[in-house]
Amino acid sequence: MSSSVVAVEQGREAVSKTVPGPILLLGAPGSGKGTQSDQLVKFWNIPHISTGDLLRANMAKGTSLGKIAQQSVNRGELVHDSLVNEMVAARLKEPDTANGYILDGFPRTLGQATWLDGRVATDGKSLPVIAVSIHVDYNQLLRRITGRRNCPVCGTIYNIHMNPPKRDGFCDVEGAALVQRADDTEQVFQERMRAYTGLTAPVVEHYRALGRFAEVDGDRPIGLIAAAIVAAVERLRK
């Protein structure tokens, strides 16, 4: 068991490991939604569904949905609701989602939230949607995004500011030259932040009004963030 998962265990004396419904992780680009999803998947033993992964898979395969999504990504825009909903709907049909799942990066718009609420209400889930937002300061987000570098061979991710490779510009494992994703520039990040803030604010208010929203501090150790999310989910369930 990883140290961060142990931190979650130690942070909660008695927590149910069964989550029969969706948990939404919200947060700006670079806030750590993917990292936290990995911790919570191990803790609750439910799948992590990342719209980013779904989008990249469709774009890599060159599907019709992927080609349209690629155009939006290159412009730093959020992909249209209908495209994302279609990708998510297909994923939710998989058998591993029967006991619940963690959604990372979805819903980002009020339309997507309404669609998800409707789906949950009609699929027999006993618990309502729970939303938790990971908050990180803007300048810290910028450092996380623009400093990100990937190894094209093994996929290892570095950050030149916070987790640099031993040899500048090269992967520690493969020795390959590191690359920066086209959408990890400051200009694209600023455009994504504007789009995210404008579209996601209504989602936050939607779940806040329903009494099913919490915000946690995302600028601290991974295990502490995960423990805070677990505590928030338990509180919202009561």
Residue ranges and their predicted role:
Residues 1-238:
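Glycine-rich phosphate-binding loop of ATP-dependent small-molecule kinases
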